[in-house]
A protein has these predicted regions:
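Alpha-helix N-cap and loop-to-helix initiation/capping positions
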Residues: 40-44, 72, 76, 107-115, ...
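Beta/alpha (TIM)-barrel catalytic core signal, keyed to glycine-rich beta->alpha loops juxtaposed to Asp/Glu
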Residues: 3-7, 12, 141-328, 343-348
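Short, acidic/polar
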Residues: 39-53, 111-127, 175-179
């Protein structure tokens, strides 16, 4: 059956300007980091993307290595674009990234020009696109001059293969350096994608949000639900089949007694607000208008709908924020900390 987008898709979504650019993003965007690889049925992927767009989510975030296995998220997304969304391409913001390992040898990861541009070409081929709207440096490269990495982003934009340049997981200092280089090249840094949640507050401690505001750069935060920890999934411990039980990016050590107690307390606060824990967690990262968009992941269309429901109650009282701060504690779950520093892992 031919897909026809909901006529009212723009009525309830909020769209925020990305820094000082002309780009607007939905307050909730869909990320395809997990749940879009070969281990997920195509019909499920298709249903998730359709539901997202019907709810006004116009931004779909990918990377070269998303899967599993790496690269396998972009291919089915491209197929969905061809079968369902060819008539809506001009209504979509599609992003991809390069930085993590994709192929063997010395040119298969990090931030060198050869890798970055080859990776972009591969992503475009997998998705069947002529261009992406945003192309990111996925992580800071401690061994490649930042001028080279930013030069690759600049080239991608000037060649018409990307409309905007962005960076991900860079700390404040590296962000300022990257933005300065891009500004001199004439291709501004439009967006930064850091991790941020109630349990991962490094962007506050680092001053990154202040830096972005000063630079006029937008922000789209990933893992605002702490890989599912800020949902009802782990309130009773680690369930079978969950990401933590599989020992993947969410490690079982993260789900300790202290963290579960804090999550339960946050869930109670959400209940008093008439929200699910996930909805409150999303509203919290969007508070005060400092974050342009929150990236969600979903394994079912219903999860997308629940997350978009967060936009119904975005305001917090001072008392609520103070109570949340009692339990929204840094939980050492920032897996991407090394991506922001020169002290990154050594090359193989």
């Amino acid at each position: 059956m031919t897909y026809v987008a909901a006529e009212n898709r723009y009525e309830k979504m909020i769209y925020n300007r990305c820094g000082r650019s002309g780009l607007k993003l939905p307050a909730i965007s869909l990320g395809l980091w997990h749940n879009f690889g070969d281990d997920t049925p195509h019909r499920t992927k298709q249903a998730i993307v359709r539901k997202a767009f019907d709810l006004g989510i116009t931004h779909f975030d990918l990377a070269n290595n998303y899967g599993p296995p790496p690269g396998s998220a972009e291919t089915p997304f491209g197929e969905i674009l061809r079968t369902d969304f060819s008539a809506y391409r001009d209504e979509l913001i599609i992003s991809t990234k390069a930085g993590y390992e994709m192929w063997a040898g010395p040119y298969g990861e990090w931030g060198g020009r050869k890798y970055m541009l080859a990776s972009l070409d591969q992503s475009l081929k997998r998705m069947g696109l002529d261009y992406v709207d945003i192309f990111y440096s996925h992580r800071f490269d401690p061994d490649t001059p930042l001028e080279e990495t930013m030069g690759a982003l600049d080239h991608a934009v000037r060649s018409g293969k990307a409309l905007y340049a962005g960076i991900s997981s860079y700390n404040s200092q590296r962000t300022r350096e990257a933005a300065d280089i891009l500004r001199q090249l004439g291709t501004p840094c439009v967006i930064h994608q850091p991790s941020y949640s109630m349990l991962n507050r490094w962007v506050e401690e680092d001053g990154l949000l202040d830096t972005l505001e000063g630079l006029g750069v937008g922000s789209i935060v990933f893992s605002p639900l702490a890989q599912g920890m800020l949902t009802d999934k782990y309130l009773g411990g680690i369930p079978d089949g969950s990401r933590a039980s599989q020992g993947k990016s969410l490690k079982t050590a993260f789900i300790n007694d202290r963290t579960i107690a804090n999550i339960k307390a946050l869930n109670a606060i959400a209940g008093k607000r008439g929200q699910t824990l996930a909805q409150m967690a999303l509203a919290w990262v969007l508070r005060r208008g400092r974050v342009t968009s929150a990236l969600i992941g979903a394994s079912r269309p219903e999860q997308v709908e629940d997350c978009v429901g967060a936009l119904k109650v975005l305001d917090f009282s001072d008392a609520e924020l103070a109570e949340i701060d009692t339990y929204a504690r840094e939980s050492d779950i920032n897996l991407w900390a090394a991506s922001a520093e020169r002290k990154g892992p050594p090359r193989k």
